[in-house]
């Protein structure tokens, strides 16, 4: 790679990182040419030498953030037993990522993407991000007969909608319960869906203990 290409990639990286930092800390409303340029350490005119507009940058951030989420899930589940246990752990790790970075959640699920040139690609990445980070375990569960192939898409859809709904209420502070209760409810709804749709009740020989001020049960 020539020196000019190396410099170009480095400067692009500065602008991309500046945009990601703004999105994580302050949300999409803070993202404008001047803010990005100031944080990157360049003039705003320089940005247009490397990107067509802010939408180009934001789309790259969506793609990068999805990669970060996928890596987070992988790192936090690699020691879990394959199958339902790792599937549950993957869903929790996905939730934990967005609890840690609510600005990314807002970008993914609350902002209007109508002005995105690559709206279709961005929407696909975002909408099915939970399915994708769990894809290996869904396939494993089907291959081992833990889940029926005919039911998997329905289960995915139900878990996706329930998980995102719970996250939206929590991150937007529409509910007053603490993080521990969020995880309790996540496990309850995930197990309820798996048990109602799978031949073995989504059982893998283990269980999840769930406790709060109102309930104390063991979901198997």
Where are these regions (language model features)?
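Basic, helix-initiating cap at the start of DNA-binding domains
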Residues: 1-26, 30-35, 39
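N-terminal intrinsically disordered/low-complexity leader segments
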Residues: 1-10, 74, 201-220
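Short amphipathic alpha-helical segment with a characteristic S/N-K-E followed by hydrophobic residues
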Residues: 15, 30, 53-58, 69
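Short hydrophobic/aromatic patch on the recognition helix
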Residues: 40-51
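Amphipathic alpha-helical linker/stalk segments
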Residues: 61-87, 106-109, 119, 130-143
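Amphipathic alpha-helical packing segments from all-alpha helical-bundle domains
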Residues: 74, 118-144, 153-157, 164, ...
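Hydrophobic alpha-helical connector segments
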Residues: 74-103, 155-159, 203, 220
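Amphipathic C-terminal alpha-helical segment
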Residues: 96-100, 136, 140, 159-178, ...
């Amino acid at each position: 790679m020539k020196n000019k290409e190396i410099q170009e990639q480095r400067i692009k990286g500065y602008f991309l990182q500046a945009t990601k930092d703004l999105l994580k800390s302050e949300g999409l409303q803070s993202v404008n040419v001047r803010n990005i340029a100031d944080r990157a350490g360049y003039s705003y005119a320089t940005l247009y030498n490397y990107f067509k507009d802010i939408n180009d940058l934001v789309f790259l951030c969506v793609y990068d953030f999805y990669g970060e989420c996928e890596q987070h899930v992988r790192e936090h589940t690699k020691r879990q037993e394959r199958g339902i246990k790792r599937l549950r752990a993957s869903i929790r790790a996905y939730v934990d990522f967005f609890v840690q970075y609510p600005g990314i959640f807002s970008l993914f699920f609350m902002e209007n993407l109508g002005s995105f040139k690559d709206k279709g690609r961005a929407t696909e990445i975002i909408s099915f991000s939970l399915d994708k980070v769990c894809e290996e375990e869904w396939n494993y569960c089907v291959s081992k007969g833990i889940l029926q192939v005919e039911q998997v898409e329905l289960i995915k859809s139900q878990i996706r909608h329930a998980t995102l709904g719970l996250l939206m209420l929590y991150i937007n502070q529409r509910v007053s319960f603490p993080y521990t209760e969020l995880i309790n409810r996540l496990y309850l709804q995930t197990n309820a869906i798996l048990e109602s749709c799978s031949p073995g009740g989504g059982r893998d020989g283990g269980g999840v203990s769930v406790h709060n001020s109102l309930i104390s049960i063991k979901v198997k």
